[in-house]
Amino acid sequence: MTGYLGLGSNQGDRLATLRAARASLERHEVTVTAGSSVYETAPEGELLDQPDFLNACVQIETALAPEPLLDVCKQVERELGRVPGGPRHGPRPVDVDLLLLGELEHRSERLVLPHPDITARRFVLEPLLELDPGLTLPDGTELSGALDLVADQRVALVDTL
């Protein structure tokens, strides 16, 4: 099944960490079929006094169901130095978010698919639409239509994944 993951980092060698996350996914029943460009973005939320983030997205193929795929995402984060339980929107060596998985809609205590903030974050939309300009949510909503709503959010293209 085709899915999309968001990658982020704002501690250490951010670009190397994103590339390591991409490589690590391949060791966990996930095939990365495409990677977006890397974008630099300012922190958001209640903790703004921290370094800028680098963000990217990857397109994947996997036979994993949503919850086991989330476990893989959390395992990759731990492998790359993230300690569970840090503050929401706080600094982190790596973040691996499950954004979309096929046409699945999923809701549990641990996971909501599609990711509930997917249309509110330009640092997610830009790389996602780079991978698939016609990408839609399971309800048919075209993600390209959400870009106008987040046009005021700063993102800067910095590298490739």
Residue ranges and their predicted role:
Residues 1-29, 36-42:
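N-terminal beta1-alpha1 ligand-phosphate binding loop
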Residues 58:
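Short basic (Lys/Arg) and small-residue
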Residues 33-36, 126:
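A short, local hydrophobic-aromatic micro-motif
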Residues 29, 44-53, 64-161:
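Flexible, gly/pro- and Lys/Arg-enriched active-site loops
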Residues 7-9, 62, 129:
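Short, structured patches in soluble enzyme cores that scaffold and shape functional sites
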